[in-house]
Each structure stands twice: as C-alpha cells, then as structure tokens.
Amino acid sequence: MSWIERILNKSNITQTRKASIPEGVWTKCDSCGQVLYRAELERNLEVCPKCDHHMRMSARARLHMLLDAGSEVELGSELEPKDILKFRDSKKYKDRISAAQKDTGEKDALVAMKGTLQGMPIVAASFEFAFMGGSMASVVGARFVRAVEQALEDNCPLVCFSSSGGARMQEALMSLMQMAKTSAALAKMQERGLPYISVLTDPTMGGVSASLAMLGDINIAEPKALIGFAGPRVIEQTVREKLPPGFQRSEFLIEKGAIDIIVRRPVMRQTLASILSKLTHQPQPSVVESKADTVAQPENQADV
C-alpha cells in the first residue's frame, strides 16, 4: 500500500467516525452561543451553565422538576382538541393539531397534574410552548379549570407555569372565551382562600398574560422572560417610538411593580415550597433533594 493510499484510508475512517455521532447530542445556547452537551443541559434544567440563560422547557419537565417523585397524577388527559369550525389558513387546523401532537407527544398545550411538593399536596399546570406556541384553546381552558376544581376538592394550592403566545386563532371566539372561563374559575379559589401561584416564563403573551397568568396571589417570573400583551415590535410600529431597553422583560416589569419576584429555575422548587408553606400556615417542609438542588450555576450568580 502506497503512502497516498494510507492517508486516504485514514481520512475515510475519520469521516465514518464523525458520521456515527447521533443527532441531538450537542446544542447551542440561544444567548451566548456556547455549544453545550445536551445531557448536561438537561441536568441543569435547561439553564446554560456558562451564561445562566434560561432556555424553554417542556411542560412535563417542569412538572417533574416541581412535584415529588411518584406523586404525580395527570388531570384531564382524556381531553383532545377538535376542529369544530373546520378552520383553514395556509393549513387545515386538524393538520396543525396532528403535527403538533406528533412533534411534542402531547394532546394539547397544557398539562395538569396533582401531587405533592415536599410532602404538601398541590395541583400544578404547565403550558407546552412547543405545541402551537402554547396557545390557549378549548382543551387548555378545560384542563386548567379541571386543575382548579381539583385544588378546590383537595383544599390545596394551585401553581401554574405559563409559556404562551396567547389565544389560538384557529378556534376564534371559543379560544377568547377561555380567558373569562379560567378567570372565573380562579375567582372561586379566591373565595375559598386557596393560594394560586403564577410562574411566568419566556414568553407569556397575549390572552394568557391578560387572564390566568397575571391573576396569581403571587406572580413569579423567570429571569429575562418576555411578558406582555402585544409584542415589542407591534408596539413600536403602533406608537412609532423606540421602546426602552429590556422593555417587557422580567427585570423591567419588577421595577414597575407588575410582578412580585424573579426566581432562577434551580431554586424555583424550594422557593415555591417556602412560599406555599407560609400561605397555607403549614410548617416549613423538610428539603427533599431533586434535580433542582444539584444544578450548576455561574460564578457570582445570586439564587433569587
């Protein structure tokens, strides 16, 4: 074998090894651009270990992070969306539903569960942004109301993680009706004196921000989450003025009094447990180790 053939053979081996690396092993941070090992990022609860950027997280991952292992019982899992209006834009609505269900593994954009948080019974709900932008439609409203009813039945708090672009246009008036429906359900919790904690994540916009997301007894936000009704570009085009830096971000809103506290994801679980123990007049629960307790954080980074 000549020296040229030996070099060519080595090159072919290298190319074969590169091609054998499975997809999805590495990902890039949306903020700093750092290439991250996917498994490490999942252990860090989708928080970049380099710049602390909070990436978007699936609904089930959030609920798994919050609730005690083995305590989760899903609510309203039998509810599925229907194309009652036979709506069509560039695609049929039923085709969009099928594609979203295939991509996410969820039937719709909200997952609700009951369980315990460090031994305290709670009900929790979380939006799935990957399902049609977390848009609120009939099934989302029905599942949220189911979660409220379960909290009323169990006489326990409700926690909701919002991540949504707003009402789902394909369901027209029926999606807008969910704003009133969910707000009316939360009024029953207020009458009973049961705590409702709203956690606003990136992004929380439109009809969701104008209803259930901002009705918490305590409104918590993750760092740098986009929160508002209309998007910044729409507002700039309407008022024809440049918006201030950080407009509609968590840090801007807390300065204006629109939210109560900003909490980093690694300490979200313990913070919620502490708040709920005070609101329900229960003893401070003992700390139960979870994924959130072992997350790496950048140097000089405050927890809350």
From Swiss-Prot:
Enzyme class per UniProt: transferase
Annotated pathway: Lipid metabolism; malonyl-CoA biosynthesis; malonyl-CoA from acetyl-CoA: step 1/1
Catalytic reaction annotation: N(6)-carboxybiotinyl-L-lysyl-[protein] + acetyl-CoA = N(6)-biotinyl-L-lysyl-[protein] + malonyl-CoA
Residue ranges that the Swiss-Prot or TrEMBL entry lists as coiled coil: none
InterPro entries recorded: AcCoA_carboxyl_beta, Acetyl_CoA_COase_Trfase_b_su, ClpP/crotonase-like_dom_sf, COA_CT_N, Znf-ACC
GO cellular component terms given for this protein: acetate CoA-transferase complex
Cofactor(s) named in the record: Zn(2+)
Binding-site list for Zn(2+): 29, 32, 48, 51
Cofactor note: Binds 1 zinc ion per subunit.
Keyword terms, alphabetized: ATP-binding, Cytoplasm, Fatty acid biosynthesis, Fatty acid metabolism, Lipid biosynthesis, Lipid metabolism, Metal-binding, Nucleotide-binding, Transferase, Zinc, Zinc-finger
Record keyword Glycoprotein present: no
Domain annotation CoA carboxyltransferase N-terminal: ranges: 25-294
Subcellular location: Cytoplasm
Record flagged with keyword Kinase: no
Pfam assignment, any one: Carboxyl_trans
EC number per UniProt: 2.1.3.15
Complex formation: Acetyl-CoA carboxylase is a heterohexamer composed of biotin carboxyl carrier protein (AccB), biotin carboxylase (AccC) and two subunits each of ACCase subunit alpha (AccA) and ACCase subunit beta (AccD).
Family as reported in the entry's similarity comment: Belongs to the AccD/PCCB family.
Function: Component of the acetyl coenzyme A carboxylase (ACC) complex. Biotin carboxylase (BC) catalyzes the carboxylation of biotin on its carrier protein (BCCP) and then the CO(2) group is transferred by the transcarboxylase to acetyl-CoA to form malonyl-CoA.
The protein's name: Acetyl-coenzyme A carboxylase carboxyl transferase subunit beta
